[in-house]
Amino acid sequence: MNIKRKNSLSTLIILSLVLIIALAGCSSNKSDSSTDSTAKTGDTANTDTTTTEGTASDTQYPITIKHAFGETVIPSKPERVVTIQWANHDVALALGVVPVGFSAANYGVQDDSGLLPWTADKLKELGADKPNIFQDTDGLDFEAISDANPDVILAAYSGITQEDYDTLSKIAPVVAYQSQPWVTTWREQVLYNAKGMGMEREGEQLIKDTEKLIADKASKYPNMKGKKVVWANFSATDLSKFHIYTPVDPRGSFLEELGMEYPESVTKQMTDATSYSLNLSAENADLLNDADIIIGYGDDSLYQAVKADPLLGKIPAIQRGSVVFIGNGTPLAASGNPNPLSIAYTIDEYLGLIDGAISKING
């Protein structure tokens, strides 16, 4: 709105009053369009999508984001951000934005809050004591998402289908994954979600800060650099096969970021360069022979079962115990798919476990 200055003091006063009334009306209309949003998130501050520093990128609108389902046009700066499925809310929170609604964590949570510890800590830091959490374990709760009245829906790291995307797009513009479900790295999560919020500059800074944290922490473990590593999952109920997360998967790519490498014997099995996993028979256990370290989900009882298996037990890393089995359903297991908040929260514990496994290579 352009208001020309007048010399008359009375005119200035009148115009000021008009402007105040107009702004109040806009605010009222926005509130009316989303009933109960303040109650769901605890207080008015919790519904604001502003950075903690109160700054935002000088983004030019409209912006277009290309993704696996086509492209999304965001016409103006989103004021109400909703995130769905895994980790996208953590990216928003790391950027100082409290979503007006987000999906409950369905793995690694130790109570009934639906929040992983790093999420809970950040919400507390931002003063959001009653977040609006979607319970969508059995599928997206489209009604709850719509009721949150979002201006944008962040799903850069997700497994949404074309049908999901079409339904969500009727509610608000959707930032979807770029190519395949569940393979978005933590950097890409930040990059695309930040762009969807009109916060590219802040997102780039968050990436730099997180990269520095990782580099600083990894530098304390120089013996980790160059070690051959594989993320492999076994099941005590069926040891006739095993499952590998490749470097395409965020779990695998993060291990490489820490300075380790996947052995060529494994990467050669990736006939599809975009495949994030391999399902192999126990007869192929020798593919893991070059691994200095094996990381996976499980506990000591699973390790003992694998060690006793006539095929899997021949893997050198299994024989010597240079393995990291991360307890199922724990926060550390949930952080295997990393994001800036989970990295900062768990990296010391994770590196300590890896260092312990490395100590057994020549032991």
Could you tell me what each predicted segment is?
Residues 142-145, 149-155, 173, 285, ...:
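Proline-aspartate-enriched helix->loop->beta-strand connector
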Residues 13-22:
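Bacterial N-terminal signal peptides
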Residues 195, 288-363:
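Structured C-terminal subdomain patch of bacterial secreted/periplasmic proteins
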Residues 23-59:
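Bacterial lipoprotein signal-peptidase II cleavage site
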Residues 71, 163-239, 336-363:
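Extracytoplasmic substrate-binding proteins
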Residues 241-276:
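Alpha-helical, coiled-coil/dimerization segments enriched in small aliphatic residues
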Residues 89-144:
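A short, structured surface patch at a secondary-structure boundary
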Residues 2-13:
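Bacterial N-terminal signal peptides that target proteins for export
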